């Protein structure tokens, strides 16, 4: 393996939406940083079978519906 071409691989903390924190190794951030997730497998509709509501961070869904809502209406 070539030397000095790979990113630094270090420990970070990952905080889930319910506040649970676990430690893993990653190339993201710096040693000891905390990655806060907006959505995770416990609340994402793809993994929960659509049982939970998707959080609209920043009003992106509302902005999309405002721009393209007319195209989605059934005729």
UniProtKB/Swiss-Prot annotation:
The cross-references to NCBIfam families, in alphabetical order and at most eight, read: L31 (TIGR00105), PRK00528.1 (NF001809)
Q: What does this protein do?
A: Binds the 23S rRNA.
Subunit: Part of the 50S ribosomal subunit.
Query: Which HAMAP family does the record match to this protein?
Result: Ribosomal_bL31_1
Q: What keywords would UniProt list here?
A: Ribonucleoprotein, Ribosomal protein, RNA-binding, rRNA-binding
- Disulfide pattern: none
User: Source species, please?
Assistant: Zymomonas mobilis subsp. mobilis (strain ATCC 31821 / ZM4 / CP4)
Q: Name one GO biological process term.
A: translation
Instruction: Report which gene this protein is encoded by.
Output: rpmE
Could you say which protein family the record assigns here? Belongs to the bacterial ribosomal protein bL31 family. Type A subfamily.
The record ties this protein, via InterPro entries, to: Ribosomal_bL28/bL31-like_sf, Ribosomal_bL31, Ribosomal_bL31_A, Ribosomal_bL31_sf
- Ribosomal protein: present as a keyword of the record? yes
Q: What Pfam families does the database record attribute to this sequence? A: Ribosomal_L31
Molecular-function GO terms, alphabetical? rRNA binding; structural constituent of ribosome
Q: Which GO cellular component terms, listed alphabetically, does the Swiss-Prot or TrEMBL entry include?
A: ribonucleoprotein complex; ribosome
Q: Which domain of life is it from?
A: Bacteria
Q: What is this protein called?
A: Large ribosomal subunit protein bL31
